[in-house]
Protein backbone atom coordinates (compact mmCIF):
# COMPACT_ATOMS: atom_id res chain seq x y z
CA UNK A 1 0.00 0.00 0.00
CA UNK A 2 1.23 3.47 -0.84
CA UNK A 3 2.29 5.60 2.16
CA UNK A 4 0.11 8.50 3.27
CA UNK A 5 1.67 11.85 4.23
CA UNK A 6 0.49 14.42 6.72
CA UNK A 7 1.94 17.35 8.69
CA UNK A 8 2.20 17.78 12.45
CA UNK A 9 2.73 21.28 13.94
CA UNK A 10 5.10 21.52 16.90
CA UNK A 11 5.76 25.12 17.91
CA UNK A 12 7.25 27.06 14.97
CA UNK A 13 8.20 23.90 13.07
CA UNK A 14 6.11 21.82 10.72
CA UNK A 15 7.08 18.15 10.82
CA UNK A 16 6.37 16.02 7.74
CA UNK A 17 5.27 12.46 8.57
CA UNK A 18 5.25 9.44 6.22
CA UNK A 19 2.75 6.79 7.41
CA UNK A 20 3.11 3.17 6.27
CA UNK A 21 0.19 0.80 7.07
CA UNK A 22 1.12 -2.89 7.33
CA UNK A 23 -1.29 -5.61 6.04
CA UNK A 24 -2.99 -8.08 8.36
CA UNK A 25 -2.44 -11.84 7.80
CA UNK A 26 -2.80 -13.11 4.23
CA UNK A 27 -4.75 -10.01 3.15
CA UNK A 28 -2.92 -7.61 0.87
CA UNK A 29 -5.15 -4.63 1.55
CA UNK A 30 -5.17 -2.29 4.55
CA UNK A 31 -8.91 -2.10 5.14
CA UNK A 32 -8.47 -2.45 8.84
CA UNK A 33 -7.00 1.13 9.11
CA UNK A 34 -9.76 3.72 9.68
CA UNK A 35 -9.78 7.55 10.24
CA UNK A 36 -10.04 6.93 13.98
CA UNK A 37 -6.74 5.11 13.80
CA UNK A 38 -5.27 8.12 11.97
CA UNK A 39 -6.22 10.55 14.79
CA UNK A 40 -4.72 8.20 17.33
CA UNK A 41 -1.50 8.02 15.30
CA UNK A 42 -1.30 11.87 15.15
CA UNK A 43 -1.68 12.27 18.91
CA UNK A 44 0.96 9.60 19.65
CA UNK A 45 3.44 11.14 17.20
CA UNK A 46 2.98 14.67 18.56
CA UNK A 47 3.93 13.56 22.05
CA UNK A 48 7.15 12.00 20.64
CA UNK A 49 8.03 14.94 18.36
CA UNK A 50 7.86 17.76 20.95
CA UNK A 51 11.03 16.73 22.92
CA UNK A 52 12.82 16.14 19.62
CA UNK A 53 12.07 19.65 18.35
CA UNK A 54 13.00 21.21 21.70
CA UNK A 55 16.40 19.45 21.64
CA UNK A 56 17.02 20.75 18.11
CA UNK A 57 16.31 24.36 19.14
CA UNK A 58 18.64 24.20 22.11
CA UNK A 59 21.44 22.89 19.97
CA UNK A 60 20.85 25.65 17.41
CA UNK A 61 21.21 28.52 19.86
CA UNK A 62 24.38 27.21 21.39
CA UNK A 63 27.59 29.09 20.50
CA UNK A 64 29.54 25.98 19.67
CA UNK A 65 27.61 23.69 17.39
CA UNK A 66 28.71 20.12 17.00
CA UNK A 67 29.20 19.05 13.40
CA UNK A 68 26.65 16.49 12.28
CA UNK A 69 28.11 13.06 11.71
CA UNK A 70 26.91 10.59 9.17
CA UNK A 71 25.76 7.52 11.07
CA UNK A 72 26.21 4.39 9.01
CA UNK A 73 24.38 2.18 11.48
CA UNK A 74 20.68 3.02 11.75
CA UNK A 75 19.37 3.90 15.19
CA UNK A 76 16.77 1.75 16.91
CA UNK A 77 13.20 2.83 16.17
CA UNK A 78 10.96 4.45 18.76
CA UNK A 79 8.10 2.04 19.58
CA UNK A 80 4.74 3.50 20.65
CA UNK A 81 1.66 1.50 21.54
CA UNK A 82 -1.88 2.90 21.65
CA UNK A 83 -5.30 1.38 22.28
CA UNK A 84 -5.85 0.08 18.75
CA UNK A 85 -2.53 0.71 16.96
CA UNK A 86 1.13 -0.09 17.41
CA UNK A 87 3.67 2.37 15.98
CA UNK A 88 7.37 2.21 15.10
CA UNK A 89 8.83 5.71 14.55
CA UNK A 90 12.11 6.34 12.60
CA UNK A 91 13.84 9.77 12.46
CA UNK A 92 15.79 10.26 9.20
CA UNK A 93 17.88 13.31 8.29
CA UNK A 94 16.77 15.29 5.29
CA UNK A 95 19.58 16.59 3.05
CA UNK A 96 17.40 19.26 1.42
CA UNK A 97 16.08 22.35 3.21
CA UNK A 98 12.38 22.95 2.59
CA UNK A 99 10.42 26.18 3.06
CA UNK A 100 6.77 27.17 3.19
CA UNK A 101 5.37 28.53 -0.07
CA UNK A 102 2.43 30.55 1.29
CA UNK A 103 4.09 33.17 3.45
CA UNK A 104 1.00 35.14 4.26
CA UNK A 105 -0.61 32.42 6.33
CA UNK A 106 2.51 30.59 7.50
CA UNK A 107 5.18 33.24 7.91
CA UNK A 108 6.50 31.97 11.22
CA UNK A 109 6.53 28.26 10.39
CA UNK A 110 9.74 26.43 9.46
CA UNK A 111 10.15 22.94 8.12
CA UNK A 112 11.79 20.50 10.50
CA UNK A 113 15.09 19.23 9.00
CA UNK A 114 14.34 15.60 9.87
CA UNK A 115 11.87 13.29 8.20
CA UNK A 116 9.64 11.05 10.34
CA UNK A 117 8.68 7.58 9.06
CA UNK A 118 5.91 5.76 10.98
CA UNK A 119 4.91 2.11 10.52
CA UNK A 120 1.40 1.26 11.86
CA UNK A 121 0.25 -2.28 12.65
CA UNK A 122 -2.78 -3.65 14.53
CA UNK A 123 -2.16 -4.81 18.10
CA UNK A 124 -2.35 -8.48 19.14
CA UNK A 125 -5.58 -9.94 20.64
CA UNK A 126 -7.76 -7.02 19.55
CA UNK A 127 -11.15 -7.12 17.72
CA UNK A 128 -11.00 -5.42 14.37
CA UNK A 129 -14.03 -3.24 13.42
CA UNK A 130 -14.54 -4.88 9.99
CA UNK A 131 -15.82 -8.22 11.53
CA UNK A 132 -12.52 -10.10 11.24
CA UNK A 133 -12.06 -12.86 13.82
CA UNK A 134 -9.38 -12.79 16.45
CA UNK A 135 -6.21 -14.68 15.66
CA UNK A 136 -5.43 -17.79 17.75
CA UNK A 137 -2.30 -18.04 19.77
CA UNK A 138 -1.35 -21.31 18.06
CA UNK A 139 -1.51 -19.69 14.62
CA UNK A 140 0.53 -16.69 15.81
CA UNK A 141 3.26 -18.98 17.23
CA UNK A 142 4.29 -20.04 13.69
CA UNK A 143 6.04 -17.62 11.44
CA UNK A 144 3.90 -16.16 8.66
CA UNK A 145 6.80 -14.54 6.82
CA UNK A 146 6.52 -16.85 3.82
CA UNK A 147 3.13 -16.30 2.15
CA UNK A 148 3.09 -19.51 0.03
CA UNK A 149 2.40 -22.82 1.73
CA UNK A 150 4.96 -24.68 -0.39
CA UNK A 151 7.79 -22.51 0.87
CA UNK A 152 6.84 -23.07 4.48
CA UNK A 153 6.35 -26.85 4.08
CA UNK A 154 9.51 -27.52 2.05
CA UNK A 155 12.25 -25.14 3.21
CA UNK A 156 15.37 -24.68 1.12
CA UNK A 157 18.17 -27.20 1.76
CA UNK A 158 21.01 -24.94 2.66
CA UNK A 159 24.48 -25.83 3.85
CA UNK A 160 23.44 -25.39 7.47
CA UNK A 161 20.66 -27.93 7.08
CA UNK A 162 22.98 -30.52 5.57
CA UNK A 163 25.51 -29.95 8.34
CA UNK A 164 22.83 -30.43 10.95
CA UNK A 165 21.73 -33.70 9.37
CA UNK A 166 25.30 -35.01 9.32
CA UNK A 167 25.83 -34.06 12.93
CA UNK A 168 22.62 -35.78 13.97
CA UNK A 169 23.70 -39.01 12.27
CA UNK A 170 27.10 -38.88 13.99
CA UNK A 171 25.46 -38.32 17.36
CA UNK A 172 23.16 -41.30 16.88
CA UNK A 173 26.05 -43.58 15.97
CA UNK A 174 28.11 -42.50 18.98
CA UNK A 175 25.20 -43.20 21.32
CA UNK A 176 24.79 -46.76 19.98
CA UNK A 177 28.48 -47.79 19.57
CA UNK A 178 30.03 -47.34 23.09
CA UNK A 179 28.38 -50.33 24.80
CA UNK A 180 29.19 -52.67 21.90
CA UNK A 181 32.82 -51.54 21.83
CA UNK A 182 33.18 -52.08 25.58
CA UNK A 183 31.84 -55.62 25.30
CA UNK A 184 34.14 -56.42 22.42
CA UNK A 185 37.16 -55.05 24.28
CA UNK A 186 36.35 -57.06 27.40
CA UNK A 187 35.96 -60.27 25.44
CA UNK A 188 39.17 -59.67 23.51
CA UNK A 189 41.16 -58.86 26.66
CA UNK A 190 39.89 -62.04 28.34
CA UNK A 191 40.92 -64.19 25.41
CA UNK A 192 44.29 -62.48 25.18
CA UNK A 193 44.99 -63.00 28.87
CA UNK A 194 44.10 -66.70 28.63
CA UNK A 195 46.31 -67.17 25.59
CA UNK A 196 49.16 -65.35 27.29
CA UNK A 197 48.84 -67.52 30.38
CA UNK A 198 48.95 -70.72 28.35
CA UNK A 199 51.85 -69.52 26.21
CA UNK A 200 53.74 -68.27 29.27
CA UNK A 201 53.46 -71.57 31.09
CA UNK A 202 54.56 -73.52 28.05
CA UNK A 203 57.53 -71.21 27.35
CA UNK A 204 58.65 -71.37 30.99
CA UNK A 205 58.64 -75.16 30.98
CA UNK A 206 60.56 -75.28 27.71
CA UNK A 207 63.19 -72.84 28.96
CA UNK A 208 63.70 -74.80 32.20
CA UNK A 209 64.28 -78.02 30.36
CA UNK A 210 66.67 -76.45 27.88
CA UNK A 211 68.75 -74.75 30.58
CA UNK A 212 68.97 -77.99 32.57
CA UNK A 213 70.40 -79.83 29.54
CA UNK A 214 72.66 -77.13 28.08
CA UNK A 215 74.21 -75.34 31.10
CA UNK A 216 76.49 -78.15 32.38
CA UNK A 217 78.04 -78.68 28.97
CA UNK A 218 78.61 -74.94 28.43
CA UNK A 219 80.20 -74.50 31.85
CA UNK A 220 82.63 -77.34 31.25
CA UNK A 221 83.58 -76.06 27.81
CA UNK A 222 84.12 -72.53 29.11
CA UNK A 223 86.33 -73.66 31.95
CA UNK A 224 88.50 -75.82 29.68
CA UNK A 225 88.84 -73.03 27.14
CA UNK A 226 89.76 -70.40 29.74
CA UNK A 227 92.34 -72.63 31.43
CA UNK A 228 93.97 -73.34 28.07
CA UNK A 229 94.15 -69.66 27.23
CA UNK A 230 95.60 -68.79 30.63
CA UNK A 231 98.36 -71.39 30.34
CA UNK A 232 99.22 -70.30 26.78
CA UNK A 233 99.43 -66.66 27.90
CA UNK A 234 101.71 -67.61 30.78
CA UNK A 235 104.03 -69.55 28.51
CA UNK A 236 104.19 -66.74 25.94
CA UNK A 237 104.85 -64.08 28.56
CA UNK A 238 107.53 -66.14 30.30
CA UNK A 239 109.40 -66.90 27.10
CA UNK A 240 109.14 -63.29 25.94
CA UNK A 241 110.51 -61.89 29.22
CA UNK A 242 113.43 -64.33 29.24
CA UNK A 243 114.35 -63.52 25.65
CA UNK A 244 114.16 -59.77 26.27
CA UNK A 245 116.41 -60.00 29.32
CA UNK A 246 119.01 -62.14 27.53
CA UNK A 247 119.12 -59.92 24.45
CA UNK A 248 119.33 -56.74 26.49
CA UNK A 249 122.25 -58.00 28.61
CA UNK A 250 124.21 -59.75 25.86
CA UNK A 251 123.64 -58.11 22.49
CA UNK A 252 121.62 -54.88 22.52
CA UNK A 253 123.61 -52.69 24.92
CA UNK A 254 127.06 -53.19 23.31
CA UNK A 255 125.67 -52.42 19.88
CA UNK A 256 124.02 -49.21 21.13
CA UNK A 257 127.29 -48.10 22.76
CA UNK A 258 129.23 -48.74 19.55
CA UNK A 259 126.67 -46.79 17.53
CA UNK A 260 126.91 -43.87 19.96
CA UNK A 261 130.72 -43.84 19.71
CA UNK A 262 130.63 -43.91 15.91
CA UNK A 263 128.13 -41.04 15.76
CA UNK A 264 130.18 -38.98 18.22
CA UNK A 265 133.42 -39.57 16.30
CA UNK A 266 131.70 -38.54 13.03
CA UNK A 267 130.44 -35.34 14.64
CA UNK A 268 133.92 -34.53 16.01
CA UNK A 269 135.54 -34.96 12.58
CA UNK A 270 132.91 -32.71 10.95
CA UNK A 271 133.53 -30.05 13.59
CA UNK A 272 137.28 -30.25 12.91
CA UNK A 273 136.82 -29.68 9.21
CA UNK A 274 134.38 -26.76 9.57
CA UNK A 275 135.40 -24.77 12.61
CA UNK A 276 139.07 -25.78 13.14
CA UNK A 277 140.90 -27.43 15.96
CA UNK A 278 140.39 -24.53 18.39
CA UNK A 279 136.62 -24.97 18.54
CA UNK A 280 136.96 -28.72 19.13
CA UNK A 281 139.34 -28.16 22.05
CA UNK A 282 136.91 -25.66 23.58
CA UNK A 283 134.08 -28.18 23.26
CA UNK A 284 136.14 -31.00 24.80
CA UNK A 285 137.18 -28.74 27.71
CA UNK A 286 133.59 -27.67 28.33
CA UNK A 287 132.34 -31.26 28.27
CA UNK A 288 135.06 -32.38 30.69
CA UNK A 289 134.29 -29.48 33.06
CA UNK A 290 130.51 -29.53 32.92
CA UNK A 291 129.83 -33.29 32.81
CA UNK A 292 132.20 -35.04 35.25
CA UNK A 293 129.60 -37.10 37.15
CA UNK A 294 127.86 -38.32 33.99
CA UNK A 295 131.14 -39.31 32.30
CA UNK A 296 132.26 -41.26 35.41
CA UNK A 297 128.98 -43.12 35.59
CA UNK A 298 129.15 -43.95 31.89
CA UNK A 299 132.72 -45.17 32.22
CA UNK A 300 131.83 -47.39 35.16
CA UNK A 301 128.87 -48.81 33.27
CA UNK A 302 130.94 -49.40 30.12
CA UNK A 303 133.84 -50.91 32.08
CA UNK A 304 131.40 -53.41 33.58
CA UNK A 305 130.25 -54.40 30.11
CA UNK A 306 133.47 -54.20 28.04
CA UNK A 307 136.89 -55.73 28.81
CA UNK A 308 139.81 -53.70 30.10
CA UNK A 309 141.72 -53.74 26.81
CA UNK A 310 139.02 -51.84 24.97
CA UNK A 311 138.88 -49.08 27.63
CA UNK A 312 142.67 -48.59 27.40
CA UNK A 313 142.49 -48.32 23.61
CA UNK A 314 139.76 -45.66 23.88
CA UNK A 315 141.83 -43.53 26.31
CA UNK A 316 144.90 -43.74 24.07
CA UNK A 317 142.90 -42.65 21.01
CA UNK A 318 141.53 -39.62 22.91
CA UNK A 319 145.04 -38.55 23.99
CA UNK A 320 146.34 -38.89 20.44
CA UNK A 321 143.55 -36.68 19.09
CA UNK A 322 144.30 -33.97 21.69
CA UNK A 323 148.03 -34.01 20.76
CA UNK A 324 147.22 -33.70 17.06
CA UNK A 325 144.92 -30.75 17.67
CA UNK A 326 147.64 -29.01 19.74
CA UNK A 327 150.21 -29.48 16.93
CA UNK A 328 147.79 -28.26 14.27
CA UNK A 329 146.75 -25.18 16.20
CA UNK A 330 150.29 -23.79 16.90
CA UNK A 331 151.20 -22.57 13.34
CA UNK A 332 147.79 -21.07 12.89
CA UNK A 333 148.02 -19.19 16.17
CA UNK A 334 151.50 -17.78 15.29
CA UNK A 335 150.29 -16.49 11.94
CA UNK A 336 147.26 -14.89 13.58
CA UNK A 337 149.45 -13.13 16.17
CA UNK A 338 151.79 -11.73 13.49
CA UNK A 339 148.88 -10.49 11.41
CA UNK A 340 147.28 -8.83 14.46
CA UNK A 341 150.59 -7.13 15.49
CA UNK A 342 150.98 -5.70 11.97
CA UNK A 343 147.45 -4.36 12.07
CA UNK A 344 148.09 -2.74 15.47
CA UNK A 345 151.25 -0.96 14.24
CA UNK A 346 149.46 0.42 11.18
CA UNK A 347 146.63 1.67 13.38
CA UNK A 348 149.14 3.46 15.68
CA UNK A 349 150.80 5.19 12.69
CA UNK A 350 147.42 6.36 11.42
CA UNK A 351 146.52 7.76 14.82
CA UNK A 352 149.84 9.65 15.07
CA UNK A 353 149.34 11.09 11.59
CA UNK A 354 145.90 12.36 12.51
CA UNK A 355 147.06 14.14 15.71
CA UNK A 356 147.37 18.01 15.52
CA UNK A 357 150.92 19.45 15.13
CA UNK A 358 151.98 22.14 17.68
CA UNK A 359 152.64 25.60 16.16
CA UNK A 360 155.69 27.61 17.29
CA UNK A 361 156.74 31.26 16.78
CA UNK A 362 159.78 30.24 14.72
CA UNK A 363 157.59 28.34 12.25
CA UNK A 364 155.36 31.40 11.85
CA UNK A 365 158.41 33.66 11.15
CA UNK A 366 159.77 31.23 8.55
CA UNK A 367 156.40 31.28 6.81
CA UNK A 368 156.43 35.11 6.74
CA UNK A 369 159.91 35.09 5.12
CA UNK A 370 158.76 32.61 2.50
CA UNK A 371 155.77 34.80 1.65
CA UNK A 372 158.00 37.89 1.33
CA UNK A 373 160.24 36.10 -1.17
CA UNK A 374 157.25 34.89 -3.15
CA UNK A 375 155.80 38.44 -3.27
CA UNK A 376 159.12 39.84 -4.59
CA UNK A 377 159.10 37.21 -7.32
CA UNK A 378 155.58 38.21 -8.24
CA UNK A 379 156.60 41.90 -8.54
CA UNK A 380 159.43 40.97 -10.93
CA UNK A 381 157.11 38.86 -13.03
CA UNK A 382 154.96 41.49 -14.74
CA UNK A 383 152.92 39.16 -16.90
CA UNK A 384 151.74 37.06 -14.00
CA UNK A 385 150.49 40.02 -11.98
CA UNK A 386 148.75 41.68 -14.91
CA UNK A 387 147.00 38.44 -15.94
CA UNK A 388 145.97 37.80 -12.34
CA UNK A 389 144.65 41.35 -11.95
CA UNK A 390 142.76 41.05 -15.20
CA UNK A 391 141.11 37.81 -14.04
CA UNK A 392 140.39 38.84 -10.44
CA UNK A 393 140.14 42.63 -10.41
CA UNK A 394 137.74 44.92 -12.31
CA UNK A 395 138.31 45.44 -16.00
CA UNK A 396 140.08 48.72 -16.75
CA UNK A 397 140.43 50.81 -19.82
CA UNK A 398 143.83 50.37 -21.55
CA UNK A 399 146.10 53.38 -21.32
CA UNK A 400 147.60 55.02 -24.34
CA UNK A 401 151.35 54.30 -24.83
CA UNK A 402 153.64 57.18 -23.75
CA UNK A 403 157.06 57.82 -25.29
CA UNK A 404 158.50 59.81 -22.41
CA UNK A 405 160.85 58.33 -19.77
CA UNK A 406 158.51 59.33 -16.96
CA UNK A 407 156.31 56.27 -17.56
CA UNK A 408 159.19 53.85 -17.05
CA UNK A 409 160.14 55.49 -13.74
CA UNK A 410 156.53 55.40 -12.63
CA UNK A 411 156.25 51.67 -13.33
CA UNK A 412 159.44 50.87 -11.36
CA UNK A 413 158.23 52.75 -8.31
CA UNK A 414 154.88 51.00 -8.62
CA UNK A 415 156.48 47.54 -8.62
CA UNK A 416 158.58 48.35 -5.55
CA UNK A 417 155.52 49.57 -3.69
CA UNK A 418 153.62 46.41 -4.61
CA UNK A 419 156.38 44.24 -3.04
CA UNK A 420 156.48 46.26 0.19
CA UNK A 421 152.71 46.26 0.58
CA UNK A 422 152.58 42.44 0.07
CA UNK A 423 155.13 41.91 2.86
CA UNK A 424 153.29 44.25 5.22
CA UNK A 425 149.92 42.61 4.52
CA UNK A 426 151.36 39.15 5.20
CA UNK A 427 152.81 40.27 8.53
CA UNK A 428 149.54 41.99 9.54
CA UNK A 429 147.34 38.91 8.74
CA UNK A 430 148.16 36.21 11.35
CA UNK A 431 145.36 33.95 10.11
CA UNK A 432 147.18 33.18 6.89
CA UNK A 433 150.36 32.34 8.78
CA UNK A 434 148.57 30.08 11.25
CA UNK A 435 146.64 28.18 8.60
CA UNK A 436 149.79 27.29 6.68
CA UNK A 437 151.64 25.19 9.31
CA UNK A 438 149.06 22.43 9.14
CA UNK A 439 149.82 21.91 5.49
CA UNK A 440 153.60 22.23 5.83
CA UNK A 441 154.15 20.14 8.98
CA UNK A 442 151.59 17.40 8.36
CA UNK A 443 153.06 14.05 7.14
CA UNK A 444 151.19 13.67 3.81
CA UNK A 445 152.27 12.50 0.33
CA UNK A 446 153.41 14.70 -2.60
CA UNK A 447 149.84 15.17 -3.82
CA UNK A 448 148.98 17.09 -0.63
CA UNK A 449 152.09 19.32 -1.13
CA UNK A 450 150.93 20.32 -4.61
CA UNK A 451 147.52 21.19 -3.17
CA UNK A 452 149.22 23.33 -0.49
CA UNK A 453 151.21 25.23 -3.13
CA UNK A 454 147.96 25.95 -4.96
CA UNK A 455 146.42 27.26 -1.72
CA UNK A 456 149.49 29.46 -1.10
CA UNK A 457 149.22 31.03 -4.54
CA UNK A 458 145.51 31.74 -3.94
CA UNK A 459 146.38 33.40 -0.61
CA UNK A 460 149.02 35.52 -2.32
CA UNK A 461 146.53 36.62 -4.93
CA UNK A 462 144.12 37.65 -2.20
CA UNK A 463 146.88 39.69 -0.54
CA UNK A 464 147.58 41.56 -3.81
CA UNK A 465 144.03 42.95 -4.15
CA UNK A 466 144.32 45.74 -1.57
CA UNK A 467 147.74 46.68 -2.99
CA UNK A 468 146.18 47.73 -6.25
CA UNK A 469 143.95 50.16 -4.43
CA UNK A 470 146.92 51.50 -2.44
CA UNK A 471 149.00 51.98 -5.55
CA UNK A 472 146.19 53.86 -7.19
CA UNK A 473 145.97 56.12 -4.16
CA UNK A 474 149.76 56.70 -4.02
CA UNK A 475 149.91 57.53 -7.72
CA UNK A 476 147.63 60.58 -7.38
CA UNK A 477 150.47 63.19 -7.16
CA UNK A 478 152.06 61.73 -10.28
CA UNK A 479 148.77 62.14 -12.09
CA UNK A 480 148.59 65.78 -10.97
CA UNK A 481 152.03 66.41 -12.40
CA UNK A 482 150.89 64.93 -15.69
CA UNK A 483 147.88 67.30 -15.69
CA UNK A 484 150.13 70.24 -15.24
CA UNK A 485 152.01 69.07 -18.33
CA UNK A 486 148.78 69.56 -20.29
CA UNK A 487 147.92 65.92 -21.03
CA UNK A 488 144.26 64.94 -20.68
CA UNK A 489 143.33 62.64 -17.76
CA UNK A 490 141.95 59.21 -18.56
CA UNK A 491 139.79 57.50 -15.90
CA UNK A 492 140.87 53.96 -15.08
CA UNK A 493 137.54 52.85 -13.63
CA UNK A 494 135.53 53.49 -16.77
CA UNK A 495 134.86 50.59 -19.06
CA UNK A 496 134.99 50.58 -22.81
CA UNK A 497 131.70 51.37 -24.45
CA UNK A 498 130.41 48.78 -26.84
CA UNK A 499 130.39 50.10 -30.40
From Swiss-Prot:
Residues 421-432 have a biased composition (Low complexity). Residues 478-490 have a biased composition (Basic and acidic residues). Residues 142-162, 179-194, 250-268, 441-456 have a biased composition (Polar residues). Residues 142-203, 250-276, 288-341, 375-499 are annotated as: Disordered. It comes from the Eukaryota. Belongs to the SLX4IP family. PANTHER family: PROTEIN SLX4IP. This is Protein SLX4IP. The gene is slx4ip.
